[in-house]
Swiss-Prot record:
Disulphide bond pairs: 52-87
The protein, known as: Ferredoxin-1
Binding-site list for [2Fe-2S] cluster: 34, 39, 42, 78
Upper taxonomic lineage: Bacteria, Pseudomonadati, Aquificota, Aquificia, Aquificales
Species, as recorded: Aquifex aeolicus (strain VF5)
Transmembrane segments: none
InterPro entries per the UniProt record, alphabetical: 2Fe-2S_ferredoxin-like_sf (IPR036010), 2Fe-2S_ferredoxin-type (IPR001041), 2Fe2S_fd_BS (IPR006058), Beta-grasp_dom_sf (IPR012675)
Family, per entry: Belongs to the 2Fe2S plant-type ferredoxin family.
UniProt key word Nucleus: no
GO MF assignments: 2 iron, 2 sulfur cluster binding; metal ion binding
Amino acid sequence: MKVIINGKEFDIPKGVRFGELSHEIEKAGIEFGCTDGQCGVCVARVIKGMECLNEPSEEEEETLWRVGAVDEDQRLTCQLVIEKEDCDEIVIESED
């Protein structure tokens, strides 16, 4: 699946948690910390394709709330998983 992160294109397969690819995704300017949804370092905005991604877990929602990321388009990049293949593309931008 085509995923564009801060303008850089990645091919990320369905079912793979983005945190497992942190070393690659960091090249697009997304910073990672713990990669397990606890630290909140990798908050980003899903600009396009949210419907293709997994729902946030309760743990992710708690972390987002704790770090002040309360908008519906904000997610922890490390917790994202593509669940649907019939999407055109997913676009993600890091927080400024």
